[in-house]
Amino acid sequence: MADNIILECTECGDRSYLSKKNKRKHPERLTLKKYCPVERQVTLHRETK
């Protein structure tokens, strides 16, 4: 069962992306490189609690 997760920019703290993840198969936090509209560059985004 996939749950919705929110991705937060590690640079500015903006939460601009939603994604889905199966928390039973992958219990660790997800980190992805995504475009941050506030920073106007690609930054590291981490899954929030």
Swiss-Prot record:
Q: Which Pfam families match?
A: Ribosomal_L33
Q: What is the lineage of its organism?
A: Bacteria, Bacillati, Bacillota, Bacilli, Lactobacillales
Keyword annotations: Ribonucleoprotein, Ribosomal protein
Q: Cross-referenced PROSITE patterns, in alphabetical order? A: RIBOSOMAL_L33
The Gene Ontology biological process annotation of the record reads: translation
Q: Which GO terms describe its molecular function?
A: structural constituent of ribosome
Taxonomy, superkingdom: Bacteria
Family per similarity comment: Belongs to the bacterial ribosomal protein bL33 family.
Q: What Gene3D superfamilies does the database record attribute to this sequence?
A: Ribosomal protein L33
Q: Which HAMAP family match?
A: Ribosomal_bL33
InterPro entries under this entry? Ribosomal_bL33, Ribosomal_bL33_CS, Ribosomal_bL33_sf, Ribosomal_zn-bd
Would you name any one GO CC term?
cytoplasm
Query: What is the designated name of this protein?
Result: Large ribosomal subunit protein bL33A
